[in-house]
Amino acid sequence: MAKQIQAIRGMNDILPTQSPLWQKVEAVLRASVAAYGYSEIRTPIVENTDLFKRSIGEVTDIVEKEMYTFEDRNGDSLTLRPEGTASTVRAGNEHGLLYNQEQRLWYMGPMFRHERPQKGRYRQFHQFGVEVYGIGSADIDAEVLMLSARLWEKLGISEHVTLELNTLGDPAERAAYREALIAFLEQHKDKLDEDSQRRMYSNPLRVLDSKDPQVQSILGDAPALMDYLGQESSQHFAQLRELLDAVGIQYRVNPRLVRGLDYYNRTVFEWVTNSLGSQGTVLAGGRYDGLVAQLGGKDTPAVGFAMGLERIVLLLETLELTQDIPAAVDVYVAAMGDSCLVEAIKVAQELRSTLPTLRVMSHCGGGNFKKQIKRADKSGAQVALLIGEEELAEGVVTVKYLRNDNEQQRVARNALSAFLAELTK
């Protein structure tokens, strides 16, 4: 026997038993962005490597360690996309979507990062994101946060997630704070872990995000970014908080919150949970007003967020919120004998035409009554429709209930659609 080929480490199959939960999550996401009037954008999985070096930043873990990068046959450096924002900006610039226009966009699809695989974190993962362009005011920041809060409400997990909020100010304010933070870190350099020492000059704000307990202890006396904000940035953050208060979205201001990507300014946020251990962040985003120009477009304000679907699915499973996921089949049609096969197929086809939302599975491959009922039960269907020679002669179908103790009954062929519509509504 030939050796079986396995999936690549960190790249998982989503099996038929798992896909209904994924479909439920995806349906909630699509319905939520539709309620806010957002439009879908789809971008290639493979992009020029320079796109991510220029947007994410060359001195980041993603670019330095995690990207899947290769040369094609022309010698061009290409990369499997590690996130969706840069591709969305590239597409917007390329197709003239962002020039003096407002755009509310969303995307969903696979991303790739060469990280250490663990529960809720994979090398191929599925990301859902929202991006808004052309609006610089705090009300749109509030809107994307309201949209994200709606997701949790519709998924039934609002009580299990918390919003953390911060502001990074504008580039000039952040530059002044950066110098003050570097000066502070230099005084404690010998106590910093290796990763923080490496980031101290290239990306010092990321030191604030260190998980090292000793570094966090040192940072207790570090200068605060809030003290370096100008009036405009302070007012933007104050207005955002006022709007969130007005609509009843609770949050916690976290002055240590920074984002792992270089392009963020002003508003940054994360939704976190205590239910997933170390994988606590379930959605993150913020404002990135400089990225469109950085990638060759005109100065354009922008704000958005992204979430990993694997982590959302894991959270729903951890909280045992998967019980209401319906089976893939409503009705199973079985022929009791070869002479009834054509009639059974016709019944199934008619039901699919008259009841488009009814999920009908036909038994194929023959077999005795016991085998067919076993397959019907395994399909998850509510009922099996049995068609034998007697049913054929009388113009009826026998309805056998699979999920309760109701006695089976006969239903006239011409009344079957109405009967099933009432039964499965």
From Swiss-Prot:
Its EC number is 6.1.1.21. Gene3D superfamilies: Anticodon-binding domain, Bira Bifunctional Protein, Domain 2. InterPro entries: aa-tRNA-synth_II, aa-tRNA-synth_II/BPL/LPL, Anticodon-bd, Anticodon-bd_dom_sf, His-tRNA-ligase, HisRS-like_core, HisRS/HisZ, HisRS_anticodon. Keywords: Aminoacyl-tRNA synthetase, ATP-binding, Cytoplasm, Ligase, Nucleotide-binding, Protein biosynthesis. It is an enzyme of class 6 (ligase). Its main location: cytoplasm. One of its GO terms (cellular component) is cytoplasm. One of its GO terms (biological process) is histidyl-tRNA aminoacylation. It catalyses: tRNA(His) + L-histidine + ATP = L-histidyl-tRNA(His) + AMP + diphosphate + H(+). NCBIfam families: hisS (TIGR00442). This is Histidine--tRNA ligase. It comes from Shewanella sp. (strain MR-7).
